[in-house]
Regions:
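A secondary-structure micro-motif
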Residues: 1-151
């Protein structure tokens, strides 16, 4: 919880990879939105080609998720690793998420829908760590300043 420096929007990981994002905190407790939540959307990339997309979960199996918005011109290979891309303050780049299991066309016809097997075993998950980004506030202030000057 907050007594230990945990705040909403902090990344949560385990030894296997990404678990989720801190959603709410109190003095001594935290609630996490796991990647196994239909409202979760994590920015990610393919390790081999470095094309980026979004990780989503669509109910069902606790070891399967999907990567969307990968362009059809991207080189995607089975068993390629999906990892965080570092585009936000929540997760640094390179934290493993899962392996490509199946590649198919998405309904929009311009991107892939990639089924992945998650590295994190949620059925046996016990210990997690929270990622602290000490430069997060500085980055947010700079982005706000840039937005204000743009207007």
């Amino acid at each position: 919880g907050e007594a230990d420096g945990v705040k909403p929007e902090m990344g949560v990981v385990c030894s296997q990879g990404v678990v989720g994002i801190v959603y709410m905190t109190s003095q001594h407790y935290s609630i996490i939105m796991p990647i196994l939540n239909v409202n979760s959307k994590i920015s990610c990339r393919l390790r081999h080609s470095e094309h980026f997309g979004s990780l989503i979960w669509e109910r069902g199996q606790d070891n399967i998720a999907y990567v969307t918005n990968i362009p059809r011109h991207a080189e995607v290979t089975l068993k390629d690793t999906v990892e965080t891309n570092g585009y936000s303050d929540i997760f640094p780049s390179g934290i493993p998420i899962g392996k490509v299991q199946r590649i198919s066309d998405s309904p929009d016809g311009i991107s892939y829908l990639i089924r992945i097997t998650l590295f994190t075993d949620f059925a046996t998950l016990r210990n997690v760590s929270v990622i602290t980004n000490y430069q997060s506030e500085e980055r947010q202030q700079l982005e706000q300043q840039a937005q204000q000057e743009k207007q």
